[in-house]
């Protein structure tokens, strides 16, 4: 992948851009094998490769510059703004959308927030696309509600220019800290979420719910989890840290008793919408802390699926799983180092198979799926 900003030394988000893609995959697989060298692994499966450009479905842009000539991109360490509208990680058609958004910012008088001076209103714009129908969600992250009336006044123009923007909202983030979003979300459109479809499974994206940024690889990851679980012929499972329900909904059929747990109420609403669309009757999704939910249960299903944040599932949950000993644990991880530490605590399990999914090309990061069987 060629990147003008990387070559010029303006952006180094893709730390591995100088490596060939085959070299990147080789290094990631080697890293994963080193982390799991103390654990018994029956089958090492080949890594799942990504497209090397145009694979992201979401752009998170810092807004800077002036209200007349806003810049969308990132803040350099020296304080300069790097405009990333032509970033090759995004599909090419994002560029035209960014240009219209810049005009809208000027028309609405949304003054970009200046970190140094602590002045201005517009901090970020977040743009997400559904690959299922090409609809888009646009979020404006504002310091306050001061400019909402101005924003709403010019909104019809924006919707006329970009009819694919079916969900538009403002998030209010008043603190002067490196926090992406605040608690308050104001939705301006009748539609409140995007519909995505992976492998025939409807999934929904709401403004504040997490969703994978590489849909092709996410689709492969969910499909693989579904295949592995169906081969086990189980009748009950938990999907902990379930997000919008992607894993559990790919694994469950109409007879499977599935319980999905996720701290985000927005994500749980999305998961419930998906389950309803699929007509699943034995599925339950709850907005709870996954670890607390598990620790309170005296019985455990045949399979526990975990997809934790980067910190992993931690000692408490590992000790609980060791004590309760479900037949299977399916572990999906965005941080193989914490996953390896967790698996090392699950001493009575062996890894039946493990596979690397290259969710984040040109970086050291990757996703891992590991099936653990009670030995």
UniProtKB/Swiss-Prot annotation:
- Keyword rRNA-binding on entry: no
Alphabetized, the UniProt keywords read:
4Fe-4S, Iron, Iron-sulfur, Metal-binding, Methyltransferase, rRNA processing, S-adenosyl-L-methionine, Transferase
Q: Which GO terms describe its biological process?
A: rRNA base methylation
- UniProt-annotated binding residues for [4Fe-4S] cluster: 3, 11, 14, 87
Question: For this protein, what is any one GO molecular function term?
Answer: rRNA (uridine-C5-)-methyltransferase activity
What Enzyme Commission number(s) does the record list for this chain?
2.1.1.189
Q: So which residues are the signal peptide here? A: none
Q: Which reaction does it catalyse?
A: uridine(747) in 23S rRNA + S-adenosyl-L-methionine = 5-methyluridine(747) in 23S rRNA + S-adenosyl-L-homocysteine + H(+)
Q: What residues make up the catalytic site?
A: 334 (nucleophile)
Residues holding S-adenosyl-L-methionine: 212, 241, 262, 307
Give, as one word, the top-level EC class. transferase
* Coiled coil, from the record: none
Protein family:
Belongs to the class I-like SAM-binding methyltransferase superfamily. RNA M5U methyltransferase family. RlmC subfamily.
Task performed by this protein: Catalyzes the formation of 5-methyl-uridine at position 747 (m5U747) in 23S rRNA.
What is this protein identified as? 23S rRNA (uracil(747)-C(5))-methyltransferase RlmC
User: Which organism is this entry from?
Assistant: Xenorhabdus nematophila (strain ATCC 19061 / DSM 3370 / CCUG 14189 / LMG 1036 / NCIMB 9965 / AN6)
Q: Could you tell me the gene encoding this protein?
A: rlmC
